[in-house]
A protein has these predicted regions:
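Active-site HxH/HxHxD metal-binding segment of metal-dependent hydrolases
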Residues: 12, 41-44, 51-132
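Binuclear metal-ion centers of metallo-dependent hydrolases, dominated by the metallo-beta-lactamase
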Residues: 225-294, 312
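Structural recognition of the beta-strand scaffold that forms the well-ordered cores
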Residues: 14, 24, 32-36, 61-65, ...
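Conserved beta-strand hairpin/beta-sheet module of binuclear metal-dependent hydrolase folds
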Residues: 2-53, 155-181, 317-319
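Zn-dependent metallo-beta-lactamase
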Residues: 1-31, 41, 275-278, 282-326
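Metallo-beta-lactamase
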Residues: 38-41, 122-124, 130-231, 243, ...
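Metal-dependent phosphodiesterase/nuclease catalytic metal-binding core
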Residues: 156-180, 234, 238, 255, ...
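Contiguous, well-ordered beta-strand patches that form the walls/edges
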Residues: 329-333
């Protein structure tokens, strides 16, 4: 269990538990938007957290489910029923790809992954990816399909006005934890060709790194980013949450690169330690081949010295990788 708290007072709140991050957004006209529904056994905690922020969970207008895993949609059907029984008129969104599959892309053999009938019955609409969902001018949210964790995981870009300053802030959110068991290629157990999801996951990370420049970022799981620790330190320091986190796209780019590192690189390393052979039984060692850089010969070869490089076709240098998240002096002491 964990306490809820305001990320942007009167606009964006953390109402999840100590593992699954759930966010409640309030528009100026009172519209309430819940991002994900959490574990099926923890609904009481999420609803108490919502009440602690001054809202009635039965007043929620939109439930946005990020993908078809139980820790995201778990309480969705129960919350949907609770709102209906209270006379509420809510809309539940889910990604089409996790609900029904890839038939719309010409691949009917790739089906949806949600098998929970009450959840399937609760879904009202599907996301129109890369299209803004407008909420009264103070809130708008854009779903971005970033498959990989599942067939249809959606990430989200929020544009929210801060009621205290009237400044419009961009908040970015990566859907999905990372590469999981369903995305590992297993030639003996791969009935739906799930191997493509590993590449899709990495593509999604790169796409978000290069196309989204947020003011702040928020995670889907609290072990991806020290959300709760930062908030507790901010409370002890007596400063607002946003003052305790670094502003700008650096944190976002670094966060996405860490998802690449801890999920993919570590996975490869652990597999190699367990069995340093490829699928054909050939032992893999660093002495099997000579390492050579692309600068050694051909069009990329250059003499030593200082060069001015011009990036074309929209290319840009982002940054390197720092394994530490939210390095700041604001919480020292």
């Amino acid at each position: 269990a964990t306490e809820s708290f305001a990320i942007i007072p009167d606009r964006l709140y953390y109402v999840g538990d100590n593992e699954v991050a759930i966010y409640l957004t309030q528009a100026d006209d009172g519209t309430l938007i819940l991002l994900d529904a959490g574990w099926p056994a923890s609904g009481y905690q999420y609803w108490r957290n919502i009440e602690a922020m001054g809202f009635d969970p039965r007043d929620i207008d939109y439930i946005l489910l990020t993908h078809g895993h139980g820790d995201q949609y778990g309480t969705g059907a129960e919350l949907d029923t609770m709102i209906k029984n209270a006379g509420g008129d809510r809309v539940v969104y889910e990604c089409y790809e996790d609900t029904y599959g890839y038939d719309i892309y010409g691949f009917p053999e790739i089906t949806g992954i949600i098998e929970d009938t009450p959840v399937l019955n609760a879904v009202d609409k599907f996301y129109i990816n890369d299209t803004w969902m407008e909420f009264d001018g103070s809130v708008r949210i854009k779903p971005v399909l970033t498959a990989g964790h599942t067939n249809g995981t959606d990430s989200f870009i929020f544009e929210l006005t801060d009621p205290a300053t009237n400044e419009t802030l961009t908040i970015s959110y990566l859907g999905g934890y990372g590469v999981n068991g369903n995305t590992k290629y297993d030639p003996d157990n791969d009935p739906t060709g799930r191997g493509y999801l590993r590449l899709a996951f990495q593509y999604g990370l790169r796409y978000l790194q290069q196309t989204v420049e947020p003011d702040y970022m928020i995670p889907q799981h609290t072990n991806q980013y020290p959300m709760l620790e930062i908030n507790k330190a901010a409370e002890e320091k007596g400063i607002p949450f946003l003052e305790a986190v670094n502003r700008g796209s650096y944190e976002w780019v670094n966060f996405l690169e860490k998802r690449q590192a801890v999920i993919t690189y570590e996975d490869y390393y652990q597999n190699w330690k367990a069995d340093p052979k490829d699928e054909f039984g050939t032992e893999i060692t660093v002495t099997d081949a000579e390492l050579q850089t692309i600068e050694a010969a051909g069009p990329y070869r250059r003499e030593g010295g200082t060069y001015q490089i011009t990036l074309t076709d929209g290319g840009r240098i982002i940054q390197g990788f720092n394994r530490y998240m939210n390095q700041t002096d604001k919480l020292s002491g």
